[in-house]
């Protein structure tokens, strides 16, 4: 396990998870709306 320094691991996991869910959500929403192909 690498040392994260001042940044707690749970914070990285929370931000990373939220960002991943947002990207996936926008991808499916864009595909459903018909504009996902333009991305």
UniProtKB/Swiss-Prot annotation:
Please give the start and end residues of each transmembrane region: 7-27
Give one Pfam hit by family name: PsbJ
Keywords, sorted A to Z: Chloroplast, Membrane, Photosynthesis, Photosystem II, Plastid, Reaction center, Thylakoid, Transmembrane, Transmembrane helix
Q: How does it sit in the membrane?
A: Single-pass membrane protein
The domain of life for this entry's organism is Eukaryota
Q: Might you report a single GO cellular component term?
A: photosystem II reaction center
Any idea where this protein resides? Answer: Plastid, Chloroplast thylakoid membrane
Q: What is its main location?
A: plastid
The alphabetized list of GO BP terms reads: photosynthesis
What function does this protein fulfil? One of the components of the core complex of photosystem II (PSII). PSII is a light-driven water:plastoquinone oxidoreductase that uses light energy to abstract electrons from H(2)O, generating O(2) and a proton gradient subsequently used for ATP formation. It consists of a core antenna complex that captures photons, and an electron transfer chain that converts photonic excitation into a charge separation.
- Which HAMAP family would you find in this protein's record? PSII_PsbJ
What quaternary arrangement does the UniProt entry report?
Answer: PSII is composed of 1 copy each of membrane proteins PsbA, PsbB, PsbC, PsbD, PsbE, PsbF, PsbH, PsbI, PsbJ, PsbK, PsbL, PsbM, PsbT, PsbX, PsbY, PsbZ, Psb30/Ycf12, at least 3 peripheral proteins of the oxygen-evolving complex and a large number of cofactors. It forms dimeric complexes.
Protein family according to the UniProt entry: Belongs to the PsbJ family.
The protein's name in its UniProt record: Photosystem II reaction center protein J
């Amino acid at each position: 396990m690498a040392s994260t320094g001042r940044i707690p691991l749970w914070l990285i996991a929370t931000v990373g998870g939220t960002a991943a869910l947002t990207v996936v959500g926008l991808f499916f929403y864009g595909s459903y709306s018909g504009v996902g192909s333009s991305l």
